């Protein structure tokens, strides 16, 4: 399936397991891949109405900017929910990276893929 991608989004928010880690906003690096079944037709017809507008990047930033989270996993879930509100997006892959408070480790991150199907019963393992 064809996809659009948004890479290098910098999203400031407070995220981390400890209070000191969340004391100041961190710049998260976000990459988004939007899987859109109609993308081919947008390209053939040169029709903006059949594709996802890049303004979605601003919506993604606004969804988490300035908020506080314990986990980057939650940040990724929130971003996926926002992306899937667009009816042209079938599923989405979100990658979120942050600089961890661990010496010698440049980045820590998570990547998730979510679709329109219901999540079902989310029981703890």
Give the residues covered by each predicted segment.
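N-terminal, polar/charged subdomain of small-to-medium soluble alpha/beta proteins
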Residues: 1-125
């Amino acid at each position: 399936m064809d996809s659009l991608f948004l890479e290098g989004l910098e999203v400031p928010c407070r995220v981390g397991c400890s209070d000191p880690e969340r004391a100041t906003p961190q710049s998260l690096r976000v990459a988004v891949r939007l899987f859109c079944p109609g993308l081919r037709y947008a390209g053939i017809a040169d029709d903006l109405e059949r594709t996802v507008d890049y303004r979605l990047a601003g919506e993604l930033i606004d969804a988490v900017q300035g908020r506080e989270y314990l986990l980057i996993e939650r940040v990724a879930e929130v971003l996926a929910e926002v992306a899937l509100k667009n009816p042209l997006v079938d599923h989405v892959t979100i990658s979120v990276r942050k600089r961890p408070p661990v010496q010698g480790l440049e980045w820590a991150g998570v990547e998730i893929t979510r679709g329109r199907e219901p999540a079902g019963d989310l029981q703890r393992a």
